Amino acid sequence: MPKTLTEKLNAIKATGKGIFVPYIMAGDHEKGLDGLAETIHFLEDLGVSAIEVGIPFSDPVADGPVIEEAGLRSLAHGTSTQALVETLKTIETEIPLVIMTYFNPLFQYGVENFVKDLADTAVKGLIIPDLPHEHANFVEPFLADTDIALIPLVSLTTGIERQKELIEGAEGFVYAVAINGVTGKSGNYRADLDKHLAQLHQVADIPVLTGFGVSSQADLERFNAVSDGVIVGSKIVKALHQGEPIQDFIRQAVAYQK
């Protein structure tokens, strides 16, 4: 039976709408983790498909400056993995949450304990950007009997045979990385990006979402046209931190009709 994240995103895809997943940094709020539910419900009320929730880490190798600084602010507020898990247990939401964490915080907490402690929460997906596919067995056995999907990341340099290997048996969605580099860098897309995304669609039987560098209305239109939806991080994080209006951008993303 498919996991909840797979079912919910496939249901959105079936309507012809683009899937929209904003990223937020847990604890990057004037109230620290006490403000997490407020942010989640703000985004839920705007109709987002799912929410990616980042765990702060001191050495975020895949993150650009906006998200790295958000992580430092969160750590300064006292955010810990344990405290986040306890906070997530108290949050009620109808949309799936996807945790983005580097492997170190997960390892320190204990993978088995982490998964068990999230069992009764809204967390339905897990992204670990620094965990090689060859080491997925460090995590996958603990997810097998849960409703949490391990999300595969596929880069632009991934050949088709490797794509098949990464995607085989995956649930939730495929995270297609739009740029070679860190999050937040926009506009420097490779000429063969659309071809790469089309190829991903041929081998994936779950939604393909494009992320890294997606930040403008033009990006929304481009990537919704060649994938099933988008993930937006740095733009959302920056707007929430600086108190900038972001509602119209999110509404446009949520309403996108293919």
Curated annotation (Swiss-Prot):
<dbReference type="Pfam" id="PF00290">
    <property type="entry name" value="Trp_syntA"/>
</dbReference>
<dbReference type="InterPro" id="IPR013785">
    <property type="entry name" value="Aldolase_TIM"/>
</dbReference>
<keyword id="KW-0028">Amino-acid biosynthesis</keyword>
<dbReference type="InterPro" id="IPR011060">
    <property type="entry name" value="RibuloseP-bd_barrel"/>
</dbReference>
<feature type="active site" description="Proton acceptor">
    <location>
        <position position="63"/>
    </location>
</feature>
<protein>
    <recommendedName>
        <fullName>Tryptophan synthase alpha chain</fullName>
        <ecNumber>4.2.1.20</ecNumber>
    </recommendedName>
</protein>
<dbReference type="GO" id="GO:0005829">
    <property type="term" value="C:cytosol"/>
</dbReference>
<comment type="pathway">
    <text>Amino-acid biosynthesis; L-tryptophan biosynthesis; L-tryptophan from chorismate: step 5/5.</text>
</comment>
<comment type="subunit">
    <text>Tetramer of two alpha and two beta chains.</text>
</comment>
<dbReference type="InterPro" id="IPR018204">
    <property type="entry name" value="Trp_synthase_alpha_AS"/>
</dbReference>
<keyword id="KW-0456">Lyase</keyword>
<feature type="active site" description="Proton acceptor">
    <location>
        <position position="52"/>
    </location>
</feature>
<keyword id="KW-0057">Aromatic amino acid biosynthesis</keyword>
<comment type="similarity">
    <text>Belongs to the TrpA family.</text>
</comment>
<dbReference type="GO" id="GO:0004834">
    <property type="term" value="F:tryptophan synthase activity"/>
</dbReference>
<keyword id="KW-0822">Tryptophan biosynthesis</keyword>
<comment type="function">
    <text>The alpha subunit is responsible for the aldol cleavage of indoleglycerol phosphate to indole and glyceraldehyde 3-phosphate.</text>
</comment>
<dbReference type="InterPro" id="IPR002028">
    <property type="entry name" value="Trp_synthase_suA"/>
</dbReference>
